[in-house]
Amino acid sequence: MAEGDITTFNAITESFSLPIGNYKKPKLLYCNNGGYFLRILPEGVVDGTRDRNDLYITLKLSALSQGEVHIKTTETGCYLAMDSSGQLYGTLTPNEECLFLETLEENHYNTYKSKKYADMNWFVGIKKNGASKKGSRTHYGQKAILFLPLPASPD
């Protein structure tokens, strides 16, 4: 191409057929901090595990409105929740502490901020050792709050 030449491209008129994620299917939430999957145990403990075959990492994300989700295990039906001290826990009864604001960040990871404590910017997080991180110790820029939703089954 010589200097001063102009390259033109044809207008794209056909629609793109990009694969759209099926949000009805169960997901695994993979944490960027240490490579853990978010796990909600039957007794209410929330932590991370690297075992992809663990029964308690398969999660169902349900949107209540745009950007607001409930997160629960498919195995036990325990909902993810955050209490007034920022501690993550699992509960069988959904309440206002079970609502999270889901945001797709610029790096293509998702963050989940407690709706009830949104003014305090408390996020779901997993520490490098796999333990849950208190919401009061989380903030933007931490790897601990970055989650990648992955399909639970490779279909």
Swiss-Prot record:
PROSITE patterns: HBGF_FGF. CDD domains: beta-trefoil_FGF1 (cd23313). GO terms for molecular function: fibroblast growth factor receptor binding; growth factor activity; heparin binding; integrin binding; S100 protein binding. Keywords: Angiogenesis, Cytoplasm, Developmental protein, Differentiation, Growth factor, Heparin-binding, Mitogen, Nucleus, Secreted. Pfam families: FGF. Residues 1-15 form a propeptide. Heparin binds at residue 33. GO terms for cellular component: cell cortex; cytoplasm; cytosol; extracellular region; extracellular space; nucleus. It is found in: Secreted; Cytoplasm; Cytoplasm, Cell cortex; Cytoplasm, Cytosol. Residues 127-143 are annotated as: Heparin-binding. GO terms for biological process: angiogenesis; branch elongation involved in ureteric bud branching; fibroblast growth factor receptor signaling pathway; mesonephric epithelium development; neurogenesis; positive regulation of angiogenesis; positive regulation of cell division; positive regulation of cell migration. Belongs to the heparin-binding growth factors family. PANTHER family: FIBROBLAST GROWTH FACTOR. Plays an important role in the regulation of cell survival, cell division, angiogenesis, cell differentiation and cell migration. Functions as a potent mitogen in vitro. Acts as a ligand for FGFR1 and integrins. Binds to FGFR1 in the presence of heparin leading to FGFR1 dimerization and activation via sequential autophosphorylation on tyrosine residues which act as docking sites for interacting proteins, leading to the activation of several signaling cascades. Binds to integrins. This is Fibroblast growth factor 1.
